[in-house]
Amino acid sequence: MLFLQPRLLLLTPLLLVALYFILPDAVINRFASIGNLGDSSTSYRVYIWMGTLAMLKDYWMCGIGPGDAAFNLVYPKYSYSGIVAPHAHNLFLQIVCDAGVVALVVFVLLLFHYFRDLCAAFCREKDPFSRLYQTAAVSGIAGFLVQAMTDYSFYNYRVLFLFWAWLALGSLLARRGQLPERGLRT
């Protein structure tokens, strides 16, 4: 399969440079503004994170309880510049807000085992299609976690369900090589 050739990875930097000339200016400007605190979206999130961290100084052990109602009840006392926010705009901060630092440790350990098991299975796997599926399972969760650094999507139950379903599918793909193959019964 052409797309699984390691030599094609050498083309990645060239493709990234080509994106600069292909993407619309609005997209390029948005990427350029990510680290700029003068950008309203970036400064908004930074202020929310600062307020959330101030709140977690008092509620780090057990959190404030799940849901946006609990967050909206407690957060305004800690918010910077009077910024109103429905959630922490960061998955990891929101987990600590909802259930405390122990929940965050459990979540991070779960993710560690997920990535470790899938990467180990990828190294053992000989079937190129299985390797492709394992790569997709790792990439899907990794991409979600990168996005989760600047937003909290679990308030949407469809996204929450898809996240856990994707984790379950990836875990199954990690253990697929250990399962006995069974033919169709006639």
Predicted feature locations:
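Hydrophobic alpha-helical segments of polytopic membrane proteins
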Residues: 1-23
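Transmembrane alpha-helices of multi-pass inner-membrane enzymes
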Residues: 9-10, 14, 135-186
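Hydrophobic transmembrane alpha-helices and their immediate junctions
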Residues: 1, 99-142
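Long extracytoplasmic/lumenal interhelical loops at the membrane interface
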Residues: 36-50, 58, 62-99, 122
